[in-house]
């Protein structure tokens, strides 16, 4: 698998992502936060057009993500490796901080992780909760999954609906939406 990490300031990050897509890399992980939405829309549209024309599909994790880690095997991104322990629980979250908290709590009680994935919190991103849940569902190294949601969109709901009818493994879904939602706002 050919992969690239993108640690480029926001004005040039979309171009760096597209460069990796044009090179037919399998996976691009973009840590950069605050890439202009218009730039990311353009990259996403070009990625979809390339795939529609039969071009190779490149998976994009992020932007604004901490990356991913499979303990004792691979770490791509900025996740603190010392809190992770090898195990059989998958973790997926849009929030880096909440990912670290969940992983730290799991590790402290002796439950390790198969893989932890931070998908990123920017408005236009690549892989969604549902994509990672499908991967965990097929992963023989994962026995259960923690899915952590935030305020911001329908992705967590879509993943939860998919899990309800398709997931073969136990899922703990945590959403901080209503705990942090201003009282005068609806989602």
Give residue ranges: language-model regions.
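Glycine-rich anion-binding loops of enzyme active sites
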Residues: 44, 48, 59-89
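Rossmann-fold NAD(P) dinucleotide-binding segment
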Residues: 12-30
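Short glycine-cluster motifs
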Residues: 87-134
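General beta-strand structural signal in soluble alpha/beta enzymes
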Residues: 30, 59-64, 68-70, 93, ...
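N-terminal glycine-rich "phosphate-gripper" loop used for MgATP/nucleotide binding
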Residues: 5-14, 32-36, 149-153
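Generic hydrophobic/aromatic pocket-lining and core-packing "Φ" positions
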Residues: 17-21, 103, 133, 160
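Conserved small/polar residues in nucleotide/adenosyl-binding loops
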Residues: 1-5, 177-183
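Rossmann-fold NAD(P)-binding glycine/threonine-rich loop
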Residues: 34-56
